[in-house]
């Protein structure tokens, strides 16, 4: 992990609103995102305006008419998105959101208060799009758009993870994440894009996944997983890739193909899919084209989000599946629950249409009859979250689990922002965990469920150059984890989000909390008794980490 100071200092500042509108001139190291390179935003697969220029934050190399371009982009946003116009007008600056932002709590920077972050762009809106701002200027809370203001807009637009916790506490329901999303789109129109995010967007548009994995790499990773499972279970398992006529398309975040602890979740998927096929005949395929459920476009711009999520519906139609299961990813679910169905047309093939007229799994596999998806939070657009899927299987007693296999773990659960707040999937993961393990404890109520604190790395904030911001932003979550670690002896933090799993090992190390990180599907895989293969509860000797399920005598 990048070197961090032993102690961090948080200085709370409370300047006047007049002072707040003065653009900052000094930019903190560890909080400033790198700008994109031409190879990310001027490639054959992903092109952004003025992307052919290599920029540095201290030399933006803006186009000559950048101001007109930016304001035209703002005008376009105001005309096409009524919510943005509403959010610009109705804020009364009550401050209810101020201390709800993890970045404000961690940095003490007043411009990281959600109300102030929105005010940075709202002041430009007032100056150019309201009569009061045009006539009274600064007295009406308006300010001129110049290069210093533009730099400040970029600096603070990329100190927000779009987690929407602030919106939960806003009495008017102002969605600051949406404001920041449209602001980032405006910045992209004058050539200002964040490097970390556009690396992932370009790779996904080119190869189908954020990591740039080619089909052979993805296939090899899955085969490696099957070989590992043979060592742990003794069973010869298989999977399908690009199988036409399969019942279900499964889409995972690409980190599950190789990263740790994501890999253990991948093994859990493979065990479950083999059990369901062997026992009920339900076929589930992966795709090398739609090999990424995540969508960094949802943090960048509408156009980028639309480009990336289009491939999933196309692949579902090409393969002729009846529905899609999505894996353990956070922003996948903001995208697939709220965006995809208005950005791209859903599949129209017969198998899809027929299943969603009567969404009973028994129509695909008779032994699963009664498992229905009529009112599932994630089922509105043809998608089912893997944890809702598993919860249904457990509730209807379609799989056998042995909770004692997870007895070495004392777990707590982190609600990913986009899963809990973004789609309302709150109780199902807890239902699954309580059914596959004996030792589970929630963190304090004001830090979980719809009030969950962000991991501090979503929204494009997982970039290495933002390590200071990340460790500060994750502080509220780490304090809650420390509470259950001390009170209950928790030794693993579970989360169904790929970015969380990448962020938390660093955060736990920095905040000196000696516990592991994993995903719920790892616990499901450990507990799952492969009855279709003749396995008995006592047969399994190793967990999905390759460690003994029960400690040796004397340990």
From Swiss-Prot:
The keyword Oxidoreductase applies. It holds the Pfam family Fer4_8. Residues 82-111, 151-180 form the 4Fe-4S ferredoxin-type domain. SUPFAM superfamilies: alpha-helical ferredoxin. This is Hdr-like menaquinol oxidoreductase iron-sulfur subunit 2. Consists of five subunits: an integral membrane subunit, a cytochrome b-like subunit, a cytochrome c subunit and two iron-sulfur subunits. InterPro entries: 4Fe4S_Fe-S-bd (IPR017896), 4Fe4S_Fe_S_CS (IPR017900), Cys_rich_dom (IPR004017), Helical_ferredxn (IPR009051).
């Amino acid at each position: 992990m990048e070197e961090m100071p032993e102690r961090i200092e948080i200085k709370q500042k409370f300047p006047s609103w007049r002072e707040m509108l003065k653009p900052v001139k000094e930019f903190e190291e560890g909080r400033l995102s790198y700008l994109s390179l031409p190879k990310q935003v001027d490639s054959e697969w992903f092109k952004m305006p003025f992307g052919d220029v290599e920029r540095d934050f201290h030399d933006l190399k803006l186009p000559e008419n950048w101001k007109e371009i930016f304001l035209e982009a703002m005008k376009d946003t105001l005309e096409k998105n009524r919510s943005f116009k509403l959010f610009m007008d109705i804020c009364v600056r009550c401050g209810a959101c101020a201390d709800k932002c993890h970045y404000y709590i961690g940095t003490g920077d007043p411009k990281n208060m959600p109300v102030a972050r929105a005010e940075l762009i709202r002041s430009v809106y007032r100056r150019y799009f309201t009569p009061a701002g045009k006539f009274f200027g600064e007295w009406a809370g308006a300010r001129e758009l110049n290069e210093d203001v533009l730099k400040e807009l970029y600096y603070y637009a990329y100190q927000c993870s779009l987690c929407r916790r602030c919106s939960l506490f806003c009495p008017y329901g102002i969605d600051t994440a949406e404001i920041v999303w449209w602001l980032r789109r405006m910045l992209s129109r004058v050539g200002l894009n964040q490097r970390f995010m556009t690396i992932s967007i370009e790779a996904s548009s080119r190869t189908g996944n954020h990591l740039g994995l080619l089909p052979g790499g993805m296939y090899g990773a899955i085969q490696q997983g099957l070989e590992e499972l043979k060592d742990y279970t003794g069973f010869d398992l298989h999977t399908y890739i690009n199988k036409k006529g399969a019942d279900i398309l499964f889409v995972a975040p690409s980190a599950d193909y190789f990263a740790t602890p994501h890999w253990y979740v991948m093994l859990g998927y493979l065990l479950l899919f083999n059990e369901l096929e062997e026992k009920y005949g339900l076929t589930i395929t992966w795709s090398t084209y739609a090999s990424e459920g995540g969508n960094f476009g949802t943090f960048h711009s509408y156009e980028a989000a639309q480009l990336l999520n289009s491939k999933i519906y196309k692949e579902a139609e090409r393969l002729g599946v009846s529905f899609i299961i999505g894996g353990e990813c956070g922003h996948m679910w903001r995208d697939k629950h709220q965006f995809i169905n208005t950005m791209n047309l859903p599949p129209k093939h017969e198998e899809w249409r027929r299943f969603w007229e009567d969404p009973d799994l028994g129509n695909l596999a008779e032994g699963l009859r009664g498992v229905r998806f009529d009112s599932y939070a994630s089922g509105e657009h043809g998608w089912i979250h893997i944890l809702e899927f598993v919860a249904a299987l457990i509730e209807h007693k379609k799989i056998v689990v042995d909770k004692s296999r997870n007895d070495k773990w004392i777990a707590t659960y982190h609600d990913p922002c986009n899963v809990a707040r973004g789609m309302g999937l709150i109780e199902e993961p807890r239902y699954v965990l309580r059914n596959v393990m004996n030792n589970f404890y929630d963190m304090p109520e004001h830090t979980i469920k719809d009030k969950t604190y962000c991991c501090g790395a979503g929204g494009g904030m997982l970039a290495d150059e933002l390590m200071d911001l990340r460790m500060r932003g994750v502080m509220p979550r780490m304090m809650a984890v420390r509470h259950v670690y001390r009170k209950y002896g928790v030794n693993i933090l579970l989360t169904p989000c790929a970015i969380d799993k990448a962020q938390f090992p660093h955060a736990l190390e920095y905040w000196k909390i000696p516990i592991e990180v994993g995903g719920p599907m790892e616990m499901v895989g450990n507990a799952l008794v492969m009855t279709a293969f003749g396995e008995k509860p006592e047969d399994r000797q190793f967990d999905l980490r390759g460690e003994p399920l029960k400690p040796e005598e004397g340990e």
